[in-house]
């Protein structure tokens, strides 16, 4: 389960790390220099995806090993603009799995409905470390925001998870994003982290999108074509 304090306070407005300390309005130029700002309430790397489209598809390579202390690891995408969203994975150290995570605007994980696969990818189960998951995010599907995950759980089950938050009614957005972060409600100085991930074959509305590096805060972000790799390392 998500730590209750994680979504309270400062994170309520910023979602997780959906916005940085210095806001970047609208479309980001590919010539924009990598931001020097720190992420709020944690550390990590972020790339923006210059598209205001409706459907994102990507394959995410989950870390085979995740070493994090004094914080919670996340790997996620989502959209920014009129509504901020974080959609992807939260690491469970207790079960050594990556659990589905979803937040859209003010609606959080407690309002997620699992339309398929909930018993195979939630509670004590989740996505297997080291596996590849295909993630599809629908910004607005009949007034709802939906995420579809195709992957393998920690018991070896291969299948689909469909998660949805209803009545989000998302309108226009300015961009999408890809992040790997460690969030904390305490001091960011105390965080220790070592994990890596990648988003490959990123498309939005069936068009390949080249990520633009935004933030590297105790992180290394590398772009290749329509793919991006992120490593979050802090000793």
From Swiss-Prot:
CDD domains: YncM_like
Source superkingdom: Bacteria
Gene3D superfamilies linked: 2.60.120.1270
Record's protein name: Uncharacterized protein YrpD
UniProt xrefs under Pfam families: YrpD
Family statement: To B.subtilis YncM.
Entry-linked InterPro entries: YrpD, YrpD-like_sf
């Amino acid at each position: 389960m998500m730590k209750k304090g994680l979504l309270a306070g400062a994170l309520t407005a910023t979602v997780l790390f959906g916005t940085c300390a210095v806001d970047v309005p609208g479309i980001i130029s590919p010539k924009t220099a990598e931001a020097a700002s720190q992420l709020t309430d944690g550390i990590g790397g972020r790339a923006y995806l210059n598209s205001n489209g409706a459907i994102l598809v990507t394959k995410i390579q989950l870390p085979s090993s995740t070493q994090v202390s004094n914080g919670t690891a996340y790997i996620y995408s989502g959209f920014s603009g009129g509504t901020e969203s974080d959609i992807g994975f939260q690491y469970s150290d207790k079960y050594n799995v990556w659990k589905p995570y979803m937040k859209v605007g003010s609606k959080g994980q407690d309002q997620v409905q699992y339309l398929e696969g909930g018993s195979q990818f939630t509670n004590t189960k989740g996505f297997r470390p080291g596996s590849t998951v295909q993630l599809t995010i629908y910004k607005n599907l009949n007034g709802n925001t939906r995420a579809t995950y195709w992957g393998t759980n920690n018991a070896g089950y291969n299948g689909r998870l469909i998660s949805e938050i209803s009545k989000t009614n998302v309108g226009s957005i300015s961009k999408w994003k890809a992040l790997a972060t460690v969030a904390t409600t305490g001091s960011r100085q105390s965080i220790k982290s070592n994990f890596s991930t990648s988003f490959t074959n990123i498309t939005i509305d069936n068009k390949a999108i080249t990520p633009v590096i935004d933030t590297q805060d105790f992180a290394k972000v590398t772009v290749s074509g329509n793919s991006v790799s992120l490593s979050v390392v802090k000793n």
